[in-house]
Amino acid sequence: MRRHHTIAIQALALSLTALSVTALEAQVNWDVVRRSTESHLRPILSPRTPLAKWIGQSSTFCYHSLDSQGKRTYYIVNAATGQRELLLPSPSQFVRAFRTFSGDTTLQEEQLELSSLNFEGGQTRFFSFRGAGKKYYRYDRKTGQFASIDKPATSFDEQKPARTKALHPRYTVYGKGYNLYLKDSTTGELRQMTHEGEEAMSFTTQASADTLSTTPRGEWWGDVYLVELQDTRGVGDMTLVNPLSKPRPRAKTFRMPMPFDKHQPQTRLYRYDARTGQGGMVEEVNHFDGGSVSLQLRPDEGEVLFTRRSRLADTLQLCRLDVATGKSQVLITEAIHPHINLTLTGYRLLRNGQIIWWSERTGYGAYYLYDRNGKELRQLTSGHELVAAHIVHIDERAGTLTFAAYGGGTGNPYYRKYYQVGLNGKGQRCLTPDEADHELELAPSGEVGLLTTSRMDLPPRYSTLALKGRSGAHLFDSIPRSMLEAAGWQAPELVRVLSADGRTPLYGVLYRPAVIDSTKRYPLISNVYPGPQTDLVPRSFALDDNGNQSLANMGCYVLNVAARGSSPFRGRDFYCYSVGQLRDYPLADDKTAIEQIAKTHPIDLDRIGIYGHSGGGFQTMAAMCTYPDFYKVGFAASGNHDNNIYINWWGEVFHGSPKIPTTIELAPRLRGKLMLTVGGMDNNVPPASTYRLAQALIKAGKPFEFFLFPDARHDLESPYYTGLLRRFFGEHLLHLSAEDLQHISYK
């Protein structure tokens, strides 16, 4: 016991080491730092962001906007034409008339807010809203007349009801404990349907309940009842201890498969025939040992489509299950080396039974059309280095497919654009050609949408976009750049560099100090996240993303560049670059990017820092130890430092072989200043990864700082976390004065 106490005291002493800074005068303009933060700028941006309230099934929507004085104005927009009109041409007249009619004085012209705004019958002439005392009123925009009404059946403040499960006219299914029971309303008989249920494989959604009210999982297909359930039997446990639980610390244990464990979670399908009383697992669903299954149940078709994926994700099959017989048929098999695209892979079904299937067989993702039996008919989408992404809309009557895509051979390949192509594979065209990122929100009709166009250096522009015809986008509103700049916003620099191979272009964002002294050279901090499932480089407009602009205004440059292997949107080879080198693949690219930036900006290459969260924390530690003479200060948060004890599919797919290299092995090579921080209740990346790294550093005699958020989970984002990061870099990399360090807030 004494040895463990010694280790704990040693780690605590490291975290409480007194600050050693030169007594200099304050050198940071903290007002500039404050004015560049998201919390300062968000109240200026948010009121100008349209939230479309679509009117029925029409192509018209309503939204409101606030000016700098907080005055709210309501508009109606015809998305087919882009034409915008005022909902209330004279708000003052509207308010006076309403007060006269209702006696309700709570409605104010200066801060006009129409609660529960609702347009009746999908028309714009009449709308209803809620006044004081939960009273509702209807207003006729044509006559200017008010009427008192009951609460409208629907409003914009209410969500659509969830789909209810199909009921059987004769049989009712109940759950008790982990199993299911069937009651025959004709005979009154109650019989047990399943017997295999247990805590790790429950047929009900309330596994701990022991009453008949427990909710069953399945649905009826005629007289056949199908149940999809998770089988976690044999899967190993992960335990966390919450030290803040009262009156005693409490252990939280959950099942968590690790890479190359024998037992993995399995999706199973149970089939029960009420006519015969026979039931059992449909074993054909689980063809791949340790793989995964995704079911798409289609009660209207009397069949079940499902995909099953091999454990290493190098094979994906689309299958059809005949519900009546329980037999399955393989329709499409996709075999990709080293693994499929886990983000974009998918399919859609047409009403005639044809299948739209996504494939990366050419190296770049595209959609293909198959008949209902799995015969390929044609490739639908195409383009040089174009990666087709999610499907936005399928108009089977018009024979068109609208989809998002990335790349295409020109410009920044990370910008999302929208395309349309015929289901005959012809006539593909780009609907949003601007060199910017786009986000499209479709109307319920699927014929028009609200389009947001932006970049990190371009505040949002709002347009309407019609999916039919060639009218293009119609601008109806935007965020004035001058308004944001006056409030303290600074446009970052969009950068393009080459990877360590000297050929592959990499893209990112460079945040600069508000004031640059031409006689000085500045430290640079690299904000990293390696992927592979995504990178965290912002493409659309964001305010002080990750706090990087306000950090830069403390007196440094901050760089965020996506390395090879960091994104599923640039083709198979780029995406799969991590395989076999999960620890090391992004390191050389990040170092090379910094060196290139230093050739065109006043960067002090002797003062390079690095930080990241999750995979970024993992990369931070690996970079600090791989290039110890280059990265001098690192801040690693919630890092998956040992991927051998992380979630199973991460290491199996993205690395591909057992014994995944860890940052723990690199601990003896640490020379710079390092902060490790983690949440004690992290149920995503087990904190054991960080604890094991800390122990390795202690054994290697390496000084470091360690901070534990006792009850935090994976996301550590908080004012205290931000203050901790700023203090660490301010002290060790920027060498700020004691007075400056005292300005850093932790709340």
Question: What do the PLM-derived regions correspond to, one by one?
Answer:
Residues R2-L12:
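Bacterial N-terminal signal peptides that target proteins for export
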Residues S15, E25-E439, E447-V448, M456-P460, ...:
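Beta-propeller folds
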Residues Q10-S20:
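Bacterial N-terminal signal peptides
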Residues A52, T307, D437-K747:
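Serine-hydrolase catalytic core recognition
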Residues S15-T17, Q379, P530, F707:
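Compositionally biased, intrinsically disordered low-complexity regions
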